[in-house]
Curated annotation (Swiss-Prot):
Gene: rppH
Stretches that traverse the bilayer: none
Name of the protein described by the UniProt record: RNA pyrophosphohydrolase
Record bears the keyword Membrane: no
Family of the protein in this entry: Belongs to the Nudix hydrolase family. RppH subfamily.
GO cellular component, one term: cytoplasm
Length: 181
């Protein structure tokens, strides 16, 4: 499904933990890393596509995550000319327009499973600092990543504050080494 401008509708998924770190995934058999993403099928809403792609690419189900935010607008990037398939019988896709989603992982990270659907997109992952992907993603996606991360930054960093507030507000522990003499 390609729009009249040549852009394929797509979803991008940013999964964060309580430390405002984001899941950074390595493309299967390659040296490039990126956020999970994937196309929107005919008749599918962006949110439905996001949950489908989340399971297909990362093995996570809706109950493993909390939806925190959705981008207000479609973010677009053009493919480099060398990646455009000019000889395809389908309409030419010159790039992707993406609706982005910020999710919080609320389950154990052991739930992350790249082979959930038998055809893995990724073969490794790690938690990275929030802005790290902007400097590391392939150059033609850099601006889209910057825009999505910027839009979601207040929400993501509020998680870190809530997490540290919970730690700070725990009942003080008594020192176990103190003994009366």
């Amino acid at each position: 499904m390609i729009d009249t401008d040549g852009y394929r509708p797509n979803v991008g998924i940013i999964i964060c933990n309580n430390n405002a770190q984001v899941l950074w995934a390595k493309r299967f058999g390659q040296h490039s890393w990126q956020f999970p993403q994937g196309g929107i099928k005919e008749g599918e809403t962006p949110e439905q596509a996001m949950y489908r792609e989340l399971y297909e690419e990362v093995g996570l189900k809706p109950e493993h995550v909390k939806l925190l935010a959705t981008s207000r607008h479609w973010l677009r990037y053009k493919l480099p000319k060398r990646l455009v398939r000019w000889d395809s019988p389908d309409p030419v896709c010159i790039g992707q327009k993406q609706r982005w989603f910020l999710l919080q992982l609320i389950s154990d990270e052991q739930q992350i499973e790249f082979e959930a659907c038998g055809n893995p997109e990724f073969d490794a992952w790690r938690w990275v600092t929030y802005w790290y992907p902007v400097r590391q993603v392939v150059s033609f996606k850099c601006e889209v990543y910057r825009c999505a991360l910027k839009e979601f930054s207040a929400v993501a960093f509020s998680l870190m504050k809530k997490s540290s507030d919970k730690k700070r507000n725990k009942r003080p522990r008594r020192a176990s080494f103190y003994k009366k003499r």
